[in-house]
């Protein structure tokens, strides 16, 4: 009785979460098929690596990812040598040394991602007083974050007639008041993919959002795998009793 009750409650919550996720803004958004969605969803490693390249070549010039370490890139399919090479392209401040002095060195896989700015003040000064948000968990900032970010990246256009846009702002139909401080970051062909994948705006955007979804929940696959095992366990126990 207890186990059957648990199963009923579990699946009720699961269905409720899926129903709730379809409410509100998502009804207006263009919804994409994401490999990592659903009970058995997983991340596409090729898409993750392409998405990291988009972040690295475009987004990292303004946006940090303070919660990630270079060694985390091993989880998306990069080899140890590739991760070492990626990290070595960045410089970090370390120390103090034996003489009490701080010093610069090349980053290592054990270091966090190096951000574009030394501090928040420099970030604001470089971006018309607007602070570029950290992207580590940006998909969690809004409900249906992956679809929202995807649509945001595609939502830039010239403003409609009689629409006033403040100085230093850009029109985007998915933002509050249809204005955003960030200029359009991606265009067709902005990044060349090493694997020959089409580098259209839609593909670049989808790959970037996939990478950002992983950075927000790197444990997602492990959690889903454990969840399935738990569900199967209780189903079997429920049948046996």
Question: Residues of each region from the PLM?
Answer:
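Post-cleavage N-terminal segment of exported redox proteins
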Residues: 2-42, 214, 241
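Electrostatic cytochrome c docking/interface patches
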Residues: 28-53, 64-78, 82-83, 196, ...
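The canonical Cys-X-X-Cys-His
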Residues: 55-66, 208
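Active-site-surrounding "flap" and adjacent substrate/cofactor-binding loops of secreted or lumenal enzymes
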Residues: 75-100
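Membrane-proximal low-complexity regions enriched in glycine and acidic/polar residues
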Residues: 91-180
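Extended, hydrophilic extramembrane loops/domains of integral membrane proteins
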Residues: 174-176, 180-217
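Juxtamembrane/start-of-transmembrane alpha-helix segments at the extracytoplasmic/lumenal side
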Residues: 216-234
């Amino acid at each position: 009785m207890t186990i059957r009750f648990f199963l009923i409650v579990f699946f009720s919550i699961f269905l409720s979460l899926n129903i709730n996720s379809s409410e509100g803004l998502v009804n207006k958004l263009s919804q994409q098929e994401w490999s990592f969605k659903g009970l058995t969803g997983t991340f596409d490693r090729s898409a993750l690596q392409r998405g990291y390249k988009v972040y690295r070549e475009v987004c990292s010039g303004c946006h940090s990812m303070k919660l990630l370490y270079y060694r985390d890139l091993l989880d998306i399919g990069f080899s140890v040598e590739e991760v070492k090479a990626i990290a070595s392209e960045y410089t970090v401040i370390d120390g103090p040394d034996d003489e009490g002095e701080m010093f610069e060195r090349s980053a290592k896989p054990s270091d966090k991602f190096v951000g574009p700015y030394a501090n928040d003040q420099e970030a604001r000064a470089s971006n018309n007083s607007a602070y570029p948000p950290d992207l580590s968990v940006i998909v969690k900032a809004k409900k249906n974050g992956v679809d929202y970010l995807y649509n945001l990246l595609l939502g830039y256009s010239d403003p409609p007639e009689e629409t006033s846009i403040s100085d230093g702002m850009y029109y985007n139909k998915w933002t509050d008041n249809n204005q955003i401080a960030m200029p359009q970051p991606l265009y067709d062909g902005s990044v060349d993919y090493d694997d020959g994948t089409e580098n259209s705006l839609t593909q670049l955007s989808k790959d970037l959002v996939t990478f950002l979804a992983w950075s927000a929940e790197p444990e997602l696959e492990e959690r889903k795998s454990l969840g399935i095992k738990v569900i199967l366990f209780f189903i079997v126990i429920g049948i046996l009793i």
